A protein has these predicted regions:
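Glycine- and charge-rich intrinsically disordered segments
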Residues: 1, 242, 249, 253, ...
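Extended, helix-rich architectural segments
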Residues: 1-140, 460-461
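Extended, non-catalytic structural segments that build the interaction scaffolds
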Residues: 30, 37-51, 55, 285-320, ...
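Extended, regular secondary-structure scaffolds
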Residues: 115, 120-228
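Extended, charged amphipathic alpha-helical segments
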Residues: 200-343, 384-387, 392
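Extended hydrophobic-aromatic, low-complexity segments
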Residues: 326-329, 397-398, 415-419, 428-432
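A glycine-biased, small/acidic residue-tolerant capping/turn segment at secondary-structure junctions
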Residues: 365-387, 430-434
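Long, highly charged low-complexity segments enriched in Glu/Asp and Lys/Arg with interspersed Ser/Thr
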Residues: 422-455
Length: 461
């Protein structure tokens, strides 16, 4: 049943407060994911009265390691298709992802999921139809950051869809536009604080989806329903690294050279005389003294300890985030066997695989919801849908060809079935090759077909 205007306003007011509280936490995370520099916060906490020079050093000391930790995972999560049984069914369920541009924008979806802890995809019936299916409307799908779309759950662990979703659309000035979603309709609301109008109800539109049309993608949901992002989990080790680099920058800026001293010199009679003597000194002058005059030097601060401490902090971040250390330090691996290289990346593969499994269910839900929006109700009831991820493991084409060739020759797997396993070959290209193979069978296949006909119908065939 569609909510009344009063009920929609009451729900929206509660969700606006909750979403703003969540937004403040996400804004702090966004400082590490966006181009803003969060290190000045560390500097202000570490020093009571920082000056402009130290603030500049704090900005220089920031290394965006958390951006790299998140991006390094998101870049390996490449969704290239859906398996739903028959090829035509799989193609139909994958088509909404393609026509809505989610295939090309999936990196942003995974980046938000891993970085913030969750992201959302909204699915609604569209206004346009497929050119080859005039009677079928396209499903509309779009990905949203949790900063723009807030999902409210009755039970985030057990429920497949949220109870409500609130989309915030910023406007110039102190104005905001909201869209509230439930399992029946979308409610349009607006707020204008400049005119003291508060929150007002505009209209509603039924979407006929039967559920709140939002699919959530979680990073690491536990049994308590918590979904921390990688920034939240690894922020402390990253800040520790920035603090160590900042200390090194201070020592490098103020104490990285020898200080020459002279004692026993006759002091100038006035400040003017002292300034005049300094003005007369040149860089290559040699000073001498008599009597009790002594010259010496104060050693510079050694930076080796700071550099080693920063390396240790970086390595600790790599360990706790299951990130290969060479991905953070730019180092090169040399003199390692193929098996050693595979083992060196094993923890990272486990991490990426876990996130792929966790989000595979959400991909299947989005595919079924899009099928329902397009009127393909049988596909919407297909619970055998699985996500097909691209193999991004670094291998040479010769290694892949050798492995697939052995699968075909030793196990008797038809060559047409392994085309999708070739890196870089899209499902469309693999299908094109299969059609060519069916239209142009090999000599062995033609001979086998002839022999089968002779065995079936006799030698006169």
């Amino acid at each position: 049943m569609v909510m009344s205007a009063t009920a929609a306003l009451d729900v929206a007011k509660d969700l606006i407060g909750e979403s703003q509280a969540a937004r403040r936490e996400l804004d702090e995370v966004d400082r590490f994911l966006a181009f803003d520099n969060p290190v000045d916060v560390v500097a202000r906490k570490a020093h009571v009265s920082p000056d402009h020079e130290k603030n500049a050093l704090a900005r220089f000391s920031h290394t965006p390691l958390l951006q790299l930790v998140v991006s390094e995972v998101a870049q390996q999560m490449v969704l290239e298709g859906i398996d739903a049984g028959a090829d035509d069914v799989s193609a139909a369920m994958w088509r909404p992802f393609e026509v809505n541009g989610l295939v090309s924008r999936q990196y942003a979806l995974w980046h938000a999921t891993v970085g913030y802890g969750e992201a959302h995809v909204m699915v609604l019936p569209g206004d346009t139809v497929y050119p080859d299916e005039p009677g079928r409307a396209k499903a509309w799908m779009s990905a949203f950051s949790p900063r723009a779309l807030f999902a409210s759950w009755n039970d985030p662990v057990e429920d497949a869809f949220p109870a409500f979703a609130l989309r915030t659309i910023g406007q110039p000035g102190k104005k905001s536009v909201y869209r509230l979603y439930d399992d029946e309709a979308v409610y349009f609301l607006a707020q204008d604080d400049t005119a003291n109008r508060g929150l007002s109800f505009i209209q509603y539109r039924e979407h006929n989806m039967g559920v709140c049309p939002v699919v959530s993608f979680q990073n690491d949901m536990d049994l308590e329903g918590r979904t921390p992002g990688d920034v939240e989990k690894f922020k402390i080790p990253a800040q520790r690294h920035d603090k160590t680099v900042y200390d090194r920058m201070l020592a490098q800026h103020y104490n990285s050279w020898k200080v020459r001293t002279a004692t026993g010199l006759e002091a100038p009679n006035s400040d003017e005389d002292a300034a005049a003597q300094k003005f007369k000194l040149a860089h290559d002058d040699i000073l001498t003294g008599e009597g009790d005059v002594k010259f010496g030097t104060l050693p510079e601060t050694q930076l080796t300890g700071f550099i080693q401490a920063a390396d240790a902090d970086r390595d600790m971040l790599a360990a706790v985030s299951q990130t290969p250390v060479w991905a953070l330090n730019g180092g090169q691996l040399v003199n390692l066997s193929a098996d050693a290289l595979v083992e060196a990346r094993s923890m990272q593969r486990l991490k990426v695989g876990q996130k792929q499994r966790a989000n595979g269910r959400s991909i299947a839900k989005a595919a079924r919801l899009a099928s329902f929006a397009e009127g393909r109700y049988e596909d919407a009831e297909n619970f055998n849908v699985t996500a097909r991820w691209a193999d991004v493991e670094s291998r040479s084409l010769a290694q892949v060809a050798d492995a697939l060739g052995k699968i075909v020759t030793m196990l008797g797997v038809p060559p047409a079935l392994v085309l999708d396993m070739i890196p870089g070959v899209t499902p469309a290209k693999a299908e094109e090759w299969r059609e060519f193979m069916r239209a142009n069978p090999s000599e062995t296949e033609r001979l086998s077909a002839t022999l089968n006909r002779q065995l079936t119908y006799g030698t006169n065939v």
